[in-house]
Every structure is written in C-alpha cells, then in structure tokens.
A protein has these predicted regions:
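Glycine-rich phosphate/pyrophosphate-handling loop used in enzymes and phosphotransfer proteins
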Residues: 1-219, 223-251
Length: 251
C-alpha cells in the first residue's frame, strides 16, 4: 500500500509542483536551464557575478572609474572627499548588474529567502579575506516598515544579517532599530530627494544594545547610500561606536 502511494503519478506531480514553486526550473539570471548550477542560478550565471575588488573608494567602496587618475592607495571618491557620509566605511559584495540584480529581485519580491544560499559561497570567500576587520563588531540590519514586512512576509536585510553573523561568528542584534515612517519608493528620485525621503524615518528602540558598540550594518543594495547613512545617523546619535556598512550589491 505504501509503495503504491509513493509510486502514485498524482503524488509525483504534487511533489514536483511544490519543488518548482520553491526552486524555479529555469535560471533566475538568464532564464535557461540551471545546468551545473545551484537552486536558482545556472553555472554560467553563478560565474558571471561580478565581485567588487580594488581599486575602490576607501570610504564608501564605490569602484574607481578606470579613466580616473586615482592613487594606488588612499583613493576617495568626490562625494566622500566632501564628507558626504556618516558611516565610517561601506563595502559591497558585487555590482548590481544583470545577474545579481535578478537574483536580489527574486529574493525580495518573490518571497524566496532561500535564494540567499546561492550567494553564501561568495560571502564566505569575501569575509575570509577581511574577517579581522570586523572582530568585536555586532551585526544589525536596516529594518523594513511593519507594513512592508507584512506584505513581503520576511525582512530580506535581516535574513542577510543573520547569515553574515553566522559566517563571521558575531552577535546579531535583533531589531535595535525600527522604521517609524513609511517612505516613498526611492527608484525615481535623485540623490538629494533620496536623502530627504528617508530623513527621520528610523529610530533606535534599544539604545542599550548599541551603546558604544561597533556596528556592522547590513542592507541589500547601496545606491546613493541615503538609507544606510540615515540609519547610521540614528545609531551614532544613540552613541554607537564605529559603523561599517555591508550590502550585497552596489548600484
């Protein structure tokens, strides 16, 4: 009887439907078969993720323009030379290009928190080279507004922060910051509008948890840096120590 149930074509179709709902048949990056790849990307797209390396701005981590006359060491972009950010340093895993962009969109908007596992090997390789720089830090994430959290079903930055805290073996601060104001979408706003849009959108709700603590602040994408900059402002207002930022992608 049990063998008949296991071999049932109907049960097989149901199982296949469940698997396909969780893991897409085609590659999220290119739409082709996921041959030689993982659960979300094919082998070629996994290899095509562009991991950011030197030369880059020492403060915000933006890759240096190859046509720019930058020094071998100590390069700072124009914005950072003006003292444009409140965080101490920011780094991103890769460029927000076609593959990483599609994977992040799938991760965020298709309720697929498991997609972060596709990037885990890159995260481990990245932090293996700079683990000492984050020793003594506590990990925190840029929070979603409660309304957006209910719509999405999970907080993508918190999931990422949890993964990074495991990789670095660092304590994870659970919700020391909250988003107290729902903000308009940033996509079509210029730099000035983005900074204004997130002004006073966050609050530190557990000041003791961040007091004199060095914080590794996690978010998914760094575009202008307005969001992580505003969260940093609130953390430092609550007397946090050094604040370093890490995002999956740099747009």
């Amino acid at each position: 009887m049990i063998n008949q149930i296991i071999q049932s074509p109907r049960l097989t179709r149901v199982c296949e439907s469940i698997v396909n709902a969780v893991f897409p048949r085609s590659c999220v990056g290119c739409g082709l078969n996921r041959k030689d790849g993982g659960d979300y990307l094919c082998g070629l797209c996994r290899d095509d993720i562009f991991v950011i390396g030197d030369p880059l701005c020492e403060t915000c981590g933006i890759p240096a323009d190859i046509d720019y006359d930058y020094p071998a060491e100590g390069f700072e972009c124009g914005w950072c030379r003006k003292g444009g950010f409140r965080f101490d340093r920011a780094r991103s895993l890769g460029l927000y290009d076609s593959v990483l962009k599609e994977l992040i969109h799938f991760y965020k908007y298709r309720n697929q928190p498991g997609a972060i596992n596709e990037i885990e090997p890159y995260l481990r390789d990245y932090f293996e080279t700079c683990r000492e720089e984050y020793q003594g830090y506590s990990v925190a994430s840029v929070p979603l507004h409660v309304k957006k959290l209910k719509e999405r079903g999970f907080d993508q930055s918190f999931v990422l922060a949890h993964k990074i805290s495991e990789i670095l073996d660092l304590p994870l601060l659970t919700r020391p910051i909250r988003r107290i104001r729902e903000t308009l979408p940033q996509a079509r706003k210029n730099r000035t509008e983005r900074f204004q849009n997130v002004r006073k959108a966050f609050d530190v709700v557990d000041a003791e948890a961040v007091l004199e603590k060095n914080i590794l602040l996690i978010d998914d994408v760094f575009t202008t840096g307005s969001t992580v900059n505003e969260v940093t402002r609130m953390l430092k207002q609550a007397r946090a120590g050094c604040v370093q930022v890490f995002t999956l992608a740099r747009a």
